[in-house]
């Protein structure tokens, strides 16, 4: 795709929007009936009190803080993930879950429902990253050129080199 200067499926010839399909893989958001990012999709009757109904229905909000932090806001919790370099090709992933005090005091609330789901997703993401890293070291791999759209990555790489 990159050799044809396509960085988004929308750029593909013949691409058709699927705006009339509510499946989250096309529209984003949570699966039908889900309230949060958890094993069973349930917020277990514990939602962050300051959220509006619209924010709760949206399901999640994401933010990134360069160079290495990701924040996910959900109806019942917030998850902060930090990627910390621990070597030239190794990182440590730190994940923190923030819950309202009232949620943690609720004896019926099972935070493992949230944590186990996110841990599984992070393990799957880590596996995909490891496969990509292996590919970089394979013999057929040849460095390419960055496209203009990728210069934010180049700026990050330049910043990282200065820090080392």
Where are these regions (language model features)?
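C-terminal catalytic domain of Rieske-type non-heme iron oxygenases
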Residues: 1-164
